[in-house]
Amino acid sequence: MARSHPLEKYRNIGIMAHIDAGKTTTTERILYYTGKSYKIGEVHEGTATMDWMEQEQERGITITSAATTCFWNDHRINIIDTPGHVDFTIEVERSLRVLDGAVTAFDGVAGVEPQSETVWRQADKYRVPRMCYVNKLDRTGANFQRCVQMIKDRLGARPAVLYLPIGIESSFVGLVDLVENRAIVWLEESLGAKFEYRDIPDDMKDEAAVARQELIELAVEQDEAAMESYLEGNEPDVATLKALLRKGTLAFDFVPVLCGSSFKNKGVQPLLDAVVDYLPSPLDIPDVQGVKLDGETPDSRPAEDSAPMSALAFKIMNDPFVGSLTFARIYSGKLEKGTYLNSVKDKKEKIGRMLLMHANSREDIEEAYAGDIVALAGLKETTTGDTLCAPSAPIILERMEFPDPVIELSVEPKTKADQEKMGIALNRLAAEDPSFRVSSDHESGQTIIKGMGELHLEILVDRMKREFKVEANVGAPQVAYREYLKKPVELVYTHKKQSGGSGQFGEVKVQVKPGERGSGFVFVDEVKGGNIPREYIPSVEKGMRETAEGGSLIGFPIVDVEVHLIDGKYHDVDSSALAFEITGRGAMREAAQKAGITILEPIMKVEVVTPEDYLGDVIGDMNSRRGQIQGTDSRGNAQVVEAMVPLANMFGYVNQLRSFTQGRAQYSMQFSHYDEVPANVADEVKAKLA
């Protein structure tokens, strides 16, 4: 089966927006008009096709990105739905990674909201060409011109206005198309599927003429010949104008601005036309970059079917009917069912079922090509952010950075029946989300879950309850501290136990010292002349390593330890692997007591993007949190503050930041390194954990 659409007719897009800008409703309408979804779902009824997790339907917010394929004007459009909530920015970044272009939706009443600024800056980071869609123009208080001004002021973008609204609020009936120079009016009874082209209303002719002139002047800047011709008094024809607008959009010189009301079924078809006309195909973006298996030598893949196959797994989700699904963007080559691929882990993966997803219905396919976004069922080794590639030409596409989790909670199942279900649920959730980890506490036997933020863990506990029917008690959030030795020590430790019959005996002489930061547990065997038989040495290491992991002073792991096993003694009858393991444990405990312990805490790299007005407040607040300001910078018309702040001082920060900046600043934080806790804070930590 050959490719159904040539690559230049592909559009891989995402719709990004603030929580209530009508992103899901817009996607719904796109699916309805492109003939893929036959009943219009409404978010406020909780039936939207894209929001397919129960939780999303109830909260009316989109949490996971579902990928959907639809067709328009002989083009194939793959839509990736992105979440709009600040704690899911990792999901947004993940979807931006695999998009070629984006539509940013704005609420026509509220304009550019804080989360819109956040996703806009993330799209800048990944160099995603985009256009703006001002939605909800039927609502009381909607103001199109004010939104356009905010796009200039708050985002620092140059808007290229393609459409003007005819009427506003309850009298909003259609649009003036400035490129084609005509009006479009929708017919109510057809649910917006039918519309008519008409002449521009008399009372709008002057306004439309001025706006069209501005648009043409913006477009002809893209081409010297067009500019000269225009200055001689010749207007570009429609095809030339579209080509110039496309060129400027792909070059980030301006952003096309459209408008409508998705809920009232007006403006969606022009939006689809603009996606086709102005957003990039996979051929318009640079070749995907990566490295060879050595992790250093740069490599790349062109968007061609004949190139070696390469794809990026960007999302794993559990489907109630198919099981685990891995969503992958194919960058190059051709993928056939039944073939074996290399995963980054240098393991082979067999491609079993391959599906094209439409929100939550699915279609089995036999093969897929460069530019496709597909769901693969039954992959065993692949996790989010991994590359899948042809074994003959391995490549690692730049790996998405997933920070280590920094906040932990204990979770306890409420009943015996919940115990087993909880284990299954947590493992499934951890497979889907690389920034979520699960472990158990040796001493208390509690299950500890770790994640990126308070809301992150809250949502996961909630999913455990809904999807897996597990009821659990949840503890308060804790910082993951570490312990570190103060100085090197040398000691002899003897373990002796005699109780009739054979006893236990082991003796070791060890030197234990603080290692370099980040070196982990290092064990060096320097025993000469068989003073400890070879088969017992791994037991000494095991005992010492496990004791270090269990901690000494406050029960957090002792990290970066270097142990030299210098000498020892054994007994022919009483010595055994177990006896030497116990000896190792005792030696590590005693070494920690003699060396003394300092406490290390996670230090976060925090970036706050704030309007200029609040810069002083943001810096003052950072200093009060033991933060060290690394620098400030301007980005567009916002100020960026970078600081290193202990995680312990960042709990509840999101709410405080919102309150003193009226919700206009946003922050991102990721783990940077562990550092020593100041003495006064260390005393507080010990007292709290004692």
UniProtKB/Swiss-Prot annotation:
Binding site for GTP: 17-24, 81-85, 135-138
The species this protein was found in: Rhizorhabdus wittichii (strain DSM 6014 / CCUG 31198 / JCM 15750 / NBRC 105917 / EY 4224 / RW1)
Protein's GO biological process: ribosome disassembly
UniProtKB keywords: Cytoplasm, Elongation factor, GTP-binding, Nucleotide-binding, Protein biosynthesis
Keyword GTP-binding listed: yes
Position of the signal peptide: none
Family note: Belongs to the TRAFAC class translation factor GTPase superfamily. Classic translation factor GTPase family. EF-G/EF-2 subfamily.
Any one of the GO CC terms: cytoplasm
Identification of the protein by name: Elongation factor G
GO molecular function terms listed in the Swiss-Prot or TrEMBL record: GTP binding; GTPase activity; translation elongation factor activity
Function field: Catalyzes the GTP-dependent ribosomal translocation step during translation elongation. During this step, the ribosome changes from the pre-translocational (PRE) to the post-translocational (POST) state as the newly formed A-site-bound peptidyl-tRNA and P-site-bound deacylated tRNA move to the P and E sites, respectively. Catalyzes the coordinated movement of the two tRNA molecules, the mRNA and conformational changes in the ribosome.
InterPro entries per record: EF-G-like_DII, EFG_II, EFG_III, EFG_III/V, EFG_IV, EFG_V, EFG_V-like, G_TR_CS
Subcellular location: Cytoplasm
Domain tr-type G stretches: 8-283
Short name of one Pfam family: EFG_C
